[in-house]
Regions:
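Generic long, charged, amphipathic alpha-helical segments
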Residues: 182-183
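Structured secondary-structure scaffolds
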Residues: 1-176, 195-238, 242-243, 257-264
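The feature captures the catalytic groove of carbohydrate-active enzymes
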Residues: 187-194
Length: 264
């Protein structure tokens, strides 16, 4: 209790500042001992988070699905966690480890305050919005070091705008749509059935990308589908049908049925 009390009041530094005889207690003579002030491992505390965070919150024996950090943590947090958990639990504290590269400036240089090339995420959100930053993160191949700067973010903003315009178009084209208007897939024209087949392929690719933690594949597949298969192809072919065919036209109803499936 005396040791616990000392560390509760003084933190880890209590070992260096405390009266060591008081820590030993009256049953031991300090002259028989030599206090050691060497650092065991700077990552020792963080390596024990599996016991004091995960198990404390979710129960003994529970381990993390994923540990996520930069490549430098193979000799840091990943390693200390593995060693401590293997020694005390007989197993790794995680099911998988995901390592990402580092964010560099637009010229591929390491960011440094002294150089003045640090890109502040808060400024990006203030200038462009959080969704632009999220899309940039999702679009980057984190297996390598990634660059970020005004030109890179401009490209991300363009991709975001195209995605948003795709959804805005569908939202407008679906005005007044109801279940009574729906057409069975078997009764749809070949073009609509083709787009639904492409949607099925997209679903398989997106799920595969997420399972593999390759989120850049997810973002690329989604944007390519929206830009090429929908905007430049499907929407362009069917725009006359949407605006010129009668409301009861089966082709128009089939088109809007597919739009409803795509949107939702």
């Amino acid at each position: 209790a005396r040791i616990l009390s000392a560390f509760r009041e003084g933190g880890a530094d209590a070992w260096f500042a405390a009266d060591h005889q008081a820590l030993l207690g009256s049953d031991y003579d300090l002259a028989d001992y030599e206090p050691v002030t060497d650092i065991l491992d700077v990552w020792f505390d963080s390596g024990s988070t599996h016991a004091f965070v995960i198990e404390a919150r979710y129960g003994e024996g529970v381990r993390a699905d994923l540990y996520l950090e930069g490549s430098d943590q193979h000799r840091g947090w990943f390693q200390s966690s593995l060693l401590e958990s293997s020694g005390t639990r007989g197993r790794a504290p995680y099911d998988a480890v995901l390592t990402h590269g580092f964010a560099l400036d637009k010229n591929g240089r390491k960011m440094s305050k002294s150089v003045g090339n640090v890109v502040d995420p808060l400024k990006i959100m203030d200038q462009s919005g959080a969704d632009i930053l999220r899309l940039w993160v999702a679009s980057t191949d984190y297996f390598e070091d990634v660059r970020i700067g005004d030109e890179v973010l401009k490209g991300t903003s363009d991709s975001y705008r195209k995605l948003r315009n795709t959804f805005r178009y569908m939202l407008g084209a679906l005005d007044g749509f109801s279940d009574a208007e729906k057409v069975a897939v078997a009764d749809m024209p070949e073009l609509e059935r083709y787009i639904l087949a492409k949607l099925g392929e997209l679903d398989v690719e997106l799920r595969s990308a997420v399972d593999a933690l390759q989120f850049h594949r997810y973002a690329r597949a989604l944007t390519e589908f929206a830009n090429e298969d929908l905007s430049a192809f499907f929407f362009d072919i069917r725009k006359d049908c949407l605006y010129c065919d009668g409301e009861d036209s089966e082709r128009r109803r089939a088109y809007r049925t597919v739009l409803d499936l795509l949107f939702h």
